[in-house]
């Protein structure tokens, strides 16, 4: 599974919250590579958020994502961010036959601002 976000800012935040707090130190944040990809819209499905409104839990989202991945209904699936619920992440299934349609548009170094720690 390739985890992407609808914006660079969301991708950075999603990554940042996964860094253990004891590793968040000035001048020690990781240098990453920001990659912008072009994916045809018709290859991305939107997740039915209403089905999870009651619980909106990580296990529920994972189960739904696993079902989508195994079924190979689409190359991509838009899912709500657990960090900012009004924003969307996009899961890409690298085993899907349409994966060759994904193009890398930009690839550049990404640095976290030390003021985040």
PLM feature segments, named:
Residues 24-117:
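Active-site and NAD+-binding cores of ADP-ribose-processing enzymes
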Residues 1-29:
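Long, hydrophobic N-terminal alpha-helical segment
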